[in-house]
UniProtKB/Swiss-Prot annotation:
Lineage start: Bacteria, Pseudomonadati, Campylobacterota, Epsilonproteobacteria, Campylobacterales
Organism: Helicobacter pylori (strain J99 / ATCC 700824) (Campylobacter pylori J99)
InterPro entries registered for this protein in UniProt: Hist_DNA-bd, IHF-like_DNA-bd_dom_sf
Protein name: DNA-binding protein HU
Molecular function terms from GO: DNA binding; structural constituent of chromatin
BP GO annotations: chromosome condensation
Quaternary state and interactors: Homodimer.
Keywords in alphabetical order: DNA condensation, DNA-binding
Amino acid sequence: MNKAEFIDLVKKAGKYNSKREAEEAINAFTLAVETALSKGESVELVGFGKFETAEQKGKEGKVPGSDKTYKTEDKRVPKFKPGKILKQKVEEGK
């Protein structure tokens, strides 16, 4: 599903009057989650899931086909843990 299709889905599910209103709601939600995560806070929506950050350790590796090696730095990455209700809905959709 692409963004335009998702906007249509949100418009119908949220009973918005226009696609613009639905898109503004989606944009507000994503901005709020981005803001919280960038501050190191987590966002928990009971039943849906939890958005949080995790530390990802740097890695060492070798470039295939050459003798060159590389190392990546440690970094903070976003993480999502689905909630119980979301897991059940996905399972029912099989």
